[in-house]
Curated annotation (Swiss-Prot):
GO terms for cellular component: cytosol. Coiled coil: none annotated. It comes from the Bacteria. It catalyses: 2-formamido-N(1)-(5-O-phospho-beta-D-ribosyl)acetamidine + ATP = 5-amino-1-(5-phospho-beta-D-ribosyl)imidazole + ADP + phosphate + H(+). Keywords: ATP-binding, Cytoplasm, Ligase, Nucleotide-binding, Purine biosynthesis. The lineage of its organism: Bacteria, Bacillati, Bacillota, Clostridia, Eubacteriales. It holds the Pfam family AIRS. It is found in: Cytoplasm. One of its GO terms (molecular function) is phosphoribosylamine-glycine ligase activity. This is Phosphoribosylformylglycinamidine cyclo-ligase. SUPFAM superfamilies: PurM C-terminal domain-like, PurM N-terminal domain-like. InterPro entries: PurM-like_C_dom (IPR010918), PurM-like_C_sf (IPR036676), PurM-like_N (IPR016188), PurM-like_N_sf (IPR036921), PurM_cligase (IPR004733). The keyword Cytoplasm applies.
Amino acid sequence: MVSYKEAGVNIEEGYKSVDLIKKHASKTFTKGVLNNLGSFAGMFELPKYKNPVLVSGTDGVGTKLDIAFRMKKYNTVGIDCVAMCVNDILCHGAKPLFFLDYIACGKLEAEVAAQLVEGVSNGCIQSECALIGGETAEMPGFYRDGEYDIAGFAVGVAEKDEIIDGSKIEDGDVLIGIASSGPHSNGYSLIRKIVEDLHKDFAGDKIGNTLLTPTKIYVKPVMKLLEKYNIKGMAHVTGGGFYENIPRMFKEDFTAVINKKSYPVPNIFNHLMNLGVEEDHMYNTFNMGIGFVLCVNEKDGENIIKDLIEMGEKGYKIGYVKKGDKSVELI
């Protein structure tokens, strides 16, 4: 008789991983969570809103995972997974409520799966949302041993009349950029092509570790700013950089004018340019040091920057909005 284990699926290792995962997930529970992990579905009680709108987003980590495999460091990419989802729904003014993850692998190693979910849990804690469920799929022969994929799904809520959709953006509004922690989770196919030795020294550490710096989660500072200021539009700067993402906040035909000298570009991006990537291609691929952009009235710009500094963030007036054609102009 052929067993499931002989086919490549280790049920006992699966049970072990679930026990380890529960320990991390329980730390994320908020008052809206109605049941524990292990049920067929996660349940979450919607907070008291007058006219609530659910806002959802899903994403993965992409080929940054290959850096994690090669460095044998698995507890940071889960943060990336959460960040990519919650930062997206944040762009519409939504407060994250809960998160679901999906992990797939060729051969399940409970300790590695637990490290991945440890990262997811840390990301959920940073964004004040609950990890209420997920799936770990062992798929022998589909993924190579030692390889994993991770994706996630976030749900948030916003009052219908407070949704930020870019409809109030005007000619002359200013753009406030909030610093990124590095490349975040985008451009890693290019990075993997030009960075050959991940153990090479960079700024006092291995460059592989630098490249695994988690994507910054902007939920807490931005939610505080939303309580105080009229924020008209927001953009999460992901794949495609400024060019691809800032115009997504525009409902009408505007052009974002960005001053490249208005903020310091982190050394990791200069290093990548020195390895042979042209500057224009860098701005078409990476966030170049700005991970999140706010569009606000000019009169609020300086106060928002001051508030960001008080919250431990780095904020810069990086440009302004003018009538145009849903584009970005770098100067």
